[in-house]
Amino acid sequence: MMSSVRTGASMALRARPTAQIVPFRAAAVASISSSSRKDATGAVAPAGAQHGIARRERREVPLPSQEGTKGAVQYALTTLDSIVNWARQSSLWPMTFGLACCAVEMMHLSTPRYDQDRLGIIFRASPRQSDVMIVAGTLTNKMAPALRQVYDQMPDPRWVISMGSCANGGGYYHYSYSVVRGCDRIVPVDIYVPGCPPTSEALMYGIFQLQRKMRNTKITRMWYRK
């Protein structure tokens, strides 16, 4: 009698389905990777709601390009900036400041092979008629005051392109006692063109980068926000 009862109980235990065993490591990964949990009714509860943490709503800040025509003044100033920047980047008049062998590649830019005139780039001999200065070559200590004087005579807005390794940081003559280790110690530089000497294509690419910088200049908008 007792043996039959034990046999029936063991058969009942074997017939009962066992619960699914979830590894501890897998359960931890699932709780970390999931950003929301479901309650008993099936609704999605935000993470941290069970701990009583209030979730703050994210506030989207519109970019200047997404403002559209909400403000008439802002729209007018943005349009005016686009027109002025287009006119400036389409008529660059560089002030030639050739100091060494990099000036040969700068002169090569004006030849028919590249024809810089088709882009509105015309070399000027007077700093008062220029808006871009191309420092091409090695800048010595004796030439530094002249560079600064020519830069001060240029009207605003003005930009500077440092052409070549010598103008960027001294280059081959970096440890010489008579060489300025970079023309950015004398005048503020906007575009650096590497190379010894850089090719005319590299200088042309530097001019394109300067035009890109001009397109993103906020002239009247910065004045209006002051």
Curated annotation (Swiss-Prot):
Organism this protein belongs to: Neurospora crassa (strain ATCC 24698 / 74-OR23-1A / CBS 708.71 / DSM 1257 / FGSC 987)
* Enzyme Commission number(s) from the entry: 7.1.1.2
Q: What is the predominant subcellular site recorded for this chain?
A: mitochondrion
**What Pfam families is this protein classified in?**
Oxidored_q6 (PF01058)
Supply the SUPFAM superfamilies for this chain: HydA/Nqo6-like
Q: Where in the cell is it found?
A: Mitochondrion
UniProt-recorded name of the protein: NADH-ubiquinone oxidoreductase 19.3 kDa subunit, mitochondrial
Region (Disordered) residue ranges read 40-68
The reaction(s) this protein catalyses:
a ubiquinone + NADH + 5 H(+)(in) = a ubiquinol + NAD(+) + 4 H(+)(out)
